[in-house]
């Protein structure tokens, strides 16, 4: 018998995750949990005596939920984890804050260095987790430290150095939930910041299928290469499996054309990896996370 910890937040059983993801595919979460605050989350983790499997969920922008759904508990940090505040010449930002919202906040307050976030879908926590980057900047360039909690309910702090940022990854422990991120502040000019953000938005809209059901870059760029060029060279621009295809506009983006399953998307990605390796000898690595069970 499944016994859930007593919490102040909200549980939902057999919860459909499809509508929360940008791809609009996937199965259900066995248990979906939105904690009220960090203490509520800590209480849940300490009480999790059955050691229910735990997955965290952000904005759903860079993830494929498999069609068989997710066993155990999916934890989503809500609005109570999205605050932005100034403390001692630093920005303290809740991990569920959207990258776009932080970029707009910084522009309004003449804080430079965050312009690139306007072009990165997802949350601050997710951005740290994958060292997201675009247009010449990455999270490693602006993060001072993070505050997190492990699955045993211990609050932990990691400095930039301890995070161990790498290209689209880091050295953080796996069983960790990021709660807050501390950023350094560099003052700038609001008008110049806005101009740069507009440049980034214009570049995105002209080169990426931002109005489609997509999950951002499918594969990380291998050293010395650009994934889209390798995919294009292999003749896979627009290639389709079921309801999923590689974008004609930017062939490192996968698209749900309306009736794709998670299996279609994952099969397409694996096929592209195979063909690129056969064509160029380069092994593409997934940038999009794939989690959950196969049906």
Swiss-Prot record:
Tell me, in a sentence or two, what this protein's role is. Answer: Cell wall formation.
Instruction: Please give the cofactor(s) recorded in the UniProt entry for this protein.
Output: FAD
Which gene does this sequence derive from? murB
What organism is the protein native to?
Rickettsia peacockii (strain Rustic)
Residues of the active site are: 168, 217, 287
Look up the coiled coil feature and give its residue ranges. none
Q: So what does this thing catalyse?
A: UDP-N-acetyl-alpha-D-muramate + NADP(+) = UDP-N-acetyl-3-O-(1-carboxyvinyl)-alpha-D-glucosamine + NADPH + H(+)
Instruction: From the UniProt record, give the pathway where this protein acts.
Output: Cell wall biogenesis; peptidoglycan biosynthesis
Q: Has keyword Iron-sulfur?
A: no
What is the protein's name according to its record? Answer: UDP-N-acetylenolpyruvoylglucosamine reductase
Q: Which Pfam family, any one of them, does this sequence belong to?
A: FAD_binding_4
Similarity section: Belongs to the MurB family.
> Can you name a GO cellular component term?
cytosol
């Amino acid at each position: 018998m499944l016994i859930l910890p007593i919490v102040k937040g909200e549980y939902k059983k057999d919860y459909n995750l499809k509508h929360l993801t940008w791809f609009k595919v996937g199965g259900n979460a066995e248990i979906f949990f939105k904690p009220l605050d960090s203490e509520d989350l800590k209480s849940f983790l300490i009480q999790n005596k059955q050691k229910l499997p735990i997955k965290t969920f952000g904005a759903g922008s860079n993830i494929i939920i498999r069609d068989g759904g997710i066993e155990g508990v999916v934890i989503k940090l809500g609005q109570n984890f999205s605050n932005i505040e100034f403390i001692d010449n630093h920005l303290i930002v809740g991990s569920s804050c959207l990258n776009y919202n932080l970029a707009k906040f910084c522009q309004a307050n003449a804080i430079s260095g965050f312009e690139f976030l306007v072009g990165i879908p997802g949350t601050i926590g997710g951005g740290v987790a994958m060292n997201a980057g675009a247009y010449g900047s990455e999270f490693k360039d602006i993060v001072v430290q993070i505050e997190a909690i492990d699955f045993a309910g211990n609050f932990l702090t990691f400095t930039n150095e301890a995070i161990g940022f790498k290209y689209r990854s880091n050295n953080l422990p796996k069983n960790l939930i990021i709660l807050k991120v501390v950023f350094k502040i560099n003052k700038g000019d609001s008008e110049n910041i806005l101009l740069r953000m507009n440049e980034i938005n214009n570049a995105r809209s002209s080169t990426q299928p931002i109005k489609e059901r997509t999950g951002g870059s499918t594969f990380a760029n291998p050293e010395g290469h650009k994934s889209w060029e390798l995919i294009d060279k292999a003749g896979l621009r627009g290639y389709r499996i079921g309801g999923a295809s590689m974008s004609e506009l930017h062939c490192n983006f996968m698209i749900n054309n309306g009736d794709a399953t998670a299996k279609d998307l994952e099969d397409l990605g694996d096929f592209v990896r195979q063909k690129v390796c056969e064509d160029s000898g380069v092994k593409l690595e997934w940038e999009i996370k794939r989690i959950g069970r196969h049906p």
